[in-house]
């Protein structure tokens, strides 16, 4: 890793807890996703939650649209070790039911669950059971009067909607909440979050909503979330993709890793390849990414196909390989080793070295 250290001054915010996961304050930025199974299919939903846990999800959101889904949530919660957020709209009784079943956070907008007495019932329940709330504002579902006032979604419209819901919780003396102001347009979302960051002290959940498929959505999220994170804004994040939710977690950690905010697993530094490559760099990287998905200890590994940039990258990596004729140079902790790798077996050899180094320095294979 380069000795250059970026300076990111984190926005000050209050700290809340989603289950056992701290959010805001000086807590690590949490990465979360959302199940896309039918919640009433308990087996499928639990299986997806387990898959998300394996790739490092800190928090997982589950849609609970009906009382039938609430009953399924009870069974799902029993089989989950990661904190679960129940996504609820309109029916306050569902919020009360999942609270009874041990939900770790409620994703509701207080203003859309009806009369003041219903809002108070949910908030009082959240107070009694120490359950935080996430206010989730979306550019596609702003209140009618705000739509009419602004004509179209604007940063100011998203802010006004958010503050309207915040005011309800303030009036009920409830401060254990976080807020999101999502939009599918990067600049709209970024500016809305900037305004919100100045207006309240609560933690902010970041997201570019409906970002798109795996490739386009990852790029859009990286740009938008990266802008905010580099400014110190954000306490949790979700990369919203029309893809397997597991990919959301992987991309989320990749974004944090690229900004050196939080690292998980191997950071591969690999060249795009050209005719100088002495071994199959692309195939090597792809194979190692799959083989080493179980690794959560942060580590920089450079895989460069020739001697032009290879030695320089290897000097600032934990492990490095520099392409050579039939055999490639191997670097450990920035120092060239006498040992060389046979290019034909470079994947097996490099995997063994990575696992040996991790076993020596971090037997518990931990996440930062």
From Swiss-Prot:
Whether 4Fe-4S counts among this entry's keywords is yes
As one GO molecular function, the record gives: 4-hydroxy-3-methylbut-2-en-1-yl diphosphate synthase activity (ferredoxin)
* GO annotation, biological process: isopentenyl diphosphate biosynthetic process, methylerythritol 4-phosphate pathway; terpenoid biosynthetic process
Give the domain of life: Bacteria
Requisite cofactors: [4Fe-4S] cluster
Keyword check for GTP-binding, yes or no: no
What is the UniProt remark on how the cofactor binds and its stoichiometry?
Binds 1 [4Fe-4S] cluster.
Which residue positions does the secretion signal occupy? none
Catalyzes what?
A: (2E)-4-hydroxy-3-methylbut-2-enyl diphosphate + oxidized [flavodoxin] + H2O + 2 H(+) = 2-C-methyl-D-erythritol 2,4-cyclic diphosphate + reduced [flavodoxin]
User: Matching Pfam families, A to Z?
Assistant: GcpE
Q: Where does [4Fe-4S] cluster bind?
A: 271, 274, 306, 313
Q: Which UniProt keywords apply?
A: 4Fe-4S, Iron, Iron-sulfur, Isoprene biosynthesis, Metal-binding, Oxidoreductase
Q: In which pathway does it act?
A: Isoprenoid biosynthesis; isopentenyl diphosphate biosynthesis via DXP pathway; isopentenyl diphosphate from 1-deoxy-D-xylulose 5-phosphate: step 5/6
Q: Which InterPro entries match?
A: Dihydropteroate_synth-like_sf, IspG_bac, IspG_bac-typ, NO2/SO3_Rdtase_4Fe4S_sf
What Enzyme Commission number does this protein have? 1.17.7.3
PANTHER family tied to this protein: 4-HYDROXY-3-METHYLBUT-2-EN-1-YL DIPHOSPHATE SYNTHASE (PTHR30454), 4-HYDROXY-3-METHYLBUT-2-EN-1-YL DIPHOSPHATE SYNTHASE (FERREDOXIN), CHLOROPLASTIC (PTHR30454:SF0)
Q: Which family does it belong to?
A: Belongs to the IspG family.
Role, per record: Converts 2C-methyl-D-erythritol 2,4-cyclodiphosphate (ME-2,4cPP) into 1-hydroxy-2-methyl-2-(E)-butenyl 4-diphosphate.
What HAMAP family does the record tag this protein with? IspG
- Specify the protein name: 4-hydroxy-3-methylbut-2-en-1-yl diphosphate synthase (flavodoxin)
> Which gene underlies this protein?
ispG
């Amino acid at each position: 890793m380069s000795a250059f250290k970026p300076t990111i001054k984190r926005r000050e915010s209050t700290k809340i807890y989603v289950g056992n996961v701290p959010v805001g304050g000086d807590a690590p930025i949490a990465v979360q996703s959302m199940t896309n199974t039918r919640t009433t299919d308990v087996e499928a939903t639990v299986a997806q939650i387990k898959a998300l846990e394996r790739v490092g999800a800190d928090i997982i959101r589950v849609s609970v649209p009906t009382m039938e889904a609430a009953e399924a949530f009870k069974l799902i919660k029993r089989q989950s070790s990661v904190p679960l957020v129940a996504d609820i709209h309109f029916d306050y009784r569902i919020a009360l039911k999942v609270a009874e079943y041990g939900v770790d956070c409620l994703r509701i907008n207080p203003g859309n669950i009806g009369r003041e007495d219903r809002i108070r019932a949910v908030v009082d329940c959240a107070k009694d059971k120490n359950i935080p709330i996430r206010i989730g504002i979306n550019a596609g579902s702003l209140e009618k009067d705000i739509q009419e006032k602004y004509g179209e979604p604007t940063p100011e419209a998203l802010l006004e909607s958010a503050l309207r819901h915040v005011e309800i919780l303030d009036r009920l003396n409830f401060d254990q909440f976080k807020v999101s102001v999502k939009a599918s347009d990067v600049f709209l979302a970024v500016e809305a979050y900037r305004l919100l960051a100045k207006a309240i002290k609560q933690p902010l959940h970041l997201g570019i909503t409906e970002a798109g498929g795996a490739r386009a959505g990852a790029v859009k999220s990286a740009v938008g979330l990266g802008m905010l994170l580099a400014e110190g804004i954000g306490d949790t994040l979700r990369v919203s993709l029309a893809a397997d939710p597991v990919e959301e977690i992987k991309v989320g950690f990749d974004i944090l890793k690229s900004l050196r905010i939080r690292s998980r697993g191997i950071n591969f530094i690999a060249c795009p390849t050209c005719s100088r490559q002495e071994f199959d760099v692309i195939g090597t990287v792809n194979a190692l990414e799959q083989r080493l998905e179980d690794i959560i200890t942060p580590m920089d590994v450079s895989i460069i196909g020739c001697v032009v940039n290879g030695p320089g990258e290897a000097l600032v990596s934990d492990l490095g390989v520099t392409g050579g004729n039939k055999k490639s140079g191997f670097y450990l902790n920035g120092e060239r080793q006498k040992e060389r790798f046979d290019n034909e077996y470079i994947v097996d050899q490099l995997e063994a070295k990575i696992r040996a180094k991790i076993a020596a320095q971090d037997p518990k294979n931990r996440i930062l």
